[in-house]
Amino acid sequence: MAASAAALLLASAAPAHAYIGPGAGFAVFGSFLVMLVALFLGGFVLLTWPVRVLIRGHRRRRAYARSQTDRVVVIGLDGMDPDIAESMMAAGRMPHLSKLRDSGTYGRLETTCPPMSPVAWSSFMTGAGPGRHGIFDFLHRDPRTYLPNLSSAQIRPPARSLRVGRFRFLLGRPVLRALRRSKPFWAVLGEHGIFSTVLRVPITFPPEPFNGLLLAGMCVPDLRGTQGSFTFFTTADEAGARHIGGERVHLVRDRGVVRGELPGPAQSGLAGAPAARLPFLVRPGGNGTARLEVNGQRVILRQGEYSDWLPLSFWLGPGMRATGICRWYLKQLEPEIELYATPINIDPERPALPISHPRIYSVYLSKRLGRYATLGLAEDTWALNEGVLDEASFLRQCQLLFEERERMLLNAVGNTRRGCVVCVFDTTDRVQHMFWRYREHDHPANRGKESAAFGAAIEEAYEQANALVGRIASSLGSGDTLIVLSDHGFKSFRRGVNVNAWLKANGYLALRPGATGDGEWLRDVDWGRTRAYAIGLGGVYLNIRGREAQGIVPREEAPALKQELIERLTGLHDEEAGQAAVNRVFDSAAVSPGPYTDSGPDLAVGYAPGYRTSWDAAQGKVAGPVIEDNTRRWSGDHCVDPDCVPGVLFCNRHLDVASARMMDIAPTILSLFGVGTPAYMEGRSLLAPTGEAGYAHA
C-alpha cells in the first residue's frame, strides 16, 4: 500500500556516501575548521544575546497584538460519531464534553467528500477541499502504470549509485516529497510569529519546515517501508499459511530454546536486496514467562503482556545499519509457542527517515517521555483482522498508544505559554472499525465468533477520550481556547461492493483474454477495451485518452460518460438485502473544484450506511460478486455518503456552528490569533461576534 521497502531502506542507508568520500584527512581538517567557526559563533551569540532577547520580545508582542487568545489547544478524536457522543452525553457518561457543550459550543461538523481521514485532516489543516490540497483517498493511481501509490508522500531512491562487486553504494539521499498541497494553518501562524506544536496529525509526513515543532502522523511508514507489517512467530507447522498485513515465521526448537529470525528492511547495499534478518532466541520459563534474547538484549516476556519498546539494529551492508523499535507479545507457550512482534517502527531516537520537525524533536520526546510508536497507523488492525491478536490484546495495544499520545500532549501544553497546540488521537477510530460488530448481533462479521464480551469497547473508548478532555481543560486558563473535533462519524460495514466487478458486468471494464480477474491491482484488465475503473475506497476513474497511458475515452466524451455512470450507479440495488447499496455518486469536478481535481478520481461513490468498498475491490481485484457480506472483524467504517457521517465540534468559546465544515477550522484558528484567512482557503471563520470564552474549569 505504501512506498516500497527498498525505497525506505535507501533512507536508512543514506549516509553511505560518506564511506567513499575524500578520506580521513578532509574529515580531520573539517573538524578543526568547525571548531574554530563554533568558537567564533559562540562568542558572537553571547555578545548579541541581550539585543536578540529584546528583538524577540518585540516581535512576540507584535505577533499577539491582535490575538483574542493566549493559547489554542486542539484535540482531534478521529472518528468520534455524533450519534454515539450525543447519546452518551444524554446518559451523563461524558461530563467534560457535556460541560464544553453547555458553556461553549457543540455542533455537528460537516466532513469532506469523500469522508476519509487523509482527506478530512488535510482539509482541517489547509482550510481547503481536495481539489486544492490534492488528497482524495488513501491511495492515488499512477496514470502511467494504473498502479496505486500512497496519496500523501513520495519516496524515491537517490539518482546515482556505485556498484562494487556484490555491493551497491547509494550516492546521496533519497528524495522525500510531500504530496499534499496548500499551506497548513500552523505554517501561516509561524509566518506571523506565532509558534505551534503539532502532534500526530495525519498527512504530515514528510515533515515540512515551519516556525514550530511537529511529530508526523498517519502515513509515516515502518522500517520496512510499509504502512505496518507485523510478524507472527510459531513453532506450529503451518506450511503455506499467509497473512494480509503481516508475515508468519516458523520458530525452530533447539535443545530447550526456540530460535527465530525477525525480518527487517531490505539490504539495499546488496544486489537483489534480500531482507535483513535479526536472529533471536526464546528460553521458556515457568509461570507463563520466557526470556527473549535479541540484539544483545535480554527481556522477560510474560504471557498476555506487551514488552516495552525494544531498539533493534539491522545490518544493511558495509557501514550501513538501520535502527527500529518494536514491542513483543507472548501469546502462548503451550502446546505451541506463539509470539507476535509489532511492525518495526522507525526509532524516534535514531530516525532512518525524518519524522519530526526539527529532526531533533523526535529525539527530545523519546528522551523526555520514553520511546513511542512512530508508525502512522500504529494500532495493528490487520493483526486483529487476521486473528493473530485477539480483542483483549488489541485493546491493550490501543491503551498503550493512547497513553503515549497523552503524555506528548500534556508535555506540549505544559511547555506552551502562548501559541497553538494540536494533537490527534486515533483510538476512537480504530476501536470502532474493529468492534462495531458488537453493536449488532446479526452483523455478518459475528458468524462463528464471540459477539458479546466486548460490547462496551466503543463506549469505553469515548469515555477515555472524555477523561482526556477533562485533564487538558483543567490545565488551561481563562484566556485559552480549547477545540475538540472529529474528522468524520461512523456507520456499520455489513456488505462490501466491488465496483470493478459491476463495471465489468456492465461493459465498462474488460479483462485480458484468459484472465480471471483475481489478480491484484487490476493486473488482469485489458486497458485497450476499458472505459472506467475503480481504485481506492470509493474512487472511479475514466480511462481518458492522453491522461492515462492506455486511455481510450476522448476527453470530449468524458462528461457524458460520467453522467451515465452517475445515473446507473446511484441507487445500485442489493438484491439479497433488498435495499440500495449506493446513496449518491459525486462528480469530483463539481464537489471538489481546484487545480488538482484532475489528479483525483473522476467520480466518488457515496455508499449507503452498511456498505463500503469490498475487501477484494480494495486490493484491485475484479473477480467475485458485485456485493457480498463483510465477515471480517473490521466491521465499522465511514467511507460512505458524507452526509451520513458528520464529525463533532466542541469549543469553550461561542462559535457559529450552523453548517460548520472541516475546512472552517483553519480560518477559525487563524482569526483567534488575529491572522487573516489566505486566499487559497475555502473555509470561513466560525468566530461569533462576541468571541467570549465560556468554559467553567474543573
Predicted feature residues:
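Metal-dependent active-site segment of extracytoplasmic phospho-/sulfohydrolases and closely related
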Residues: Y462-L503, A580-S588, G594-Y596, A604-G606, ...
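His/Asp/Glu-rich, glycine-adjacent segments
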Residues: A128-K449, T530-A580, S614
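Substrate-binding rim/cap in mid-to-C-terminal beta-strand-loop elements of soluble/periplasmic
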Residues: L503-R555, N630-F673
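N-terminal secretory/membrane targeting signals
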Residues: M1-A18
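Active-site-proximal N-terminal segment of extracellular/periplasmic enzymes that hydrolyze or transfer
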Residues: R56-Y106, P115, E191, F195, ...
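Short, structured active-site-proximal loop/turn typified by the sulfatase FGly-forming signature C/S-X-P-X-R
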Residues: A85-I135, L139, T197, A510-L511
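Hydrophobic alpha-helical membrane-interaction elements
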Residues: I20-L46
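Polar, surface-exposed loop/tail segments
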Residues: P207-F210, S492, E557, K562-E564, ...
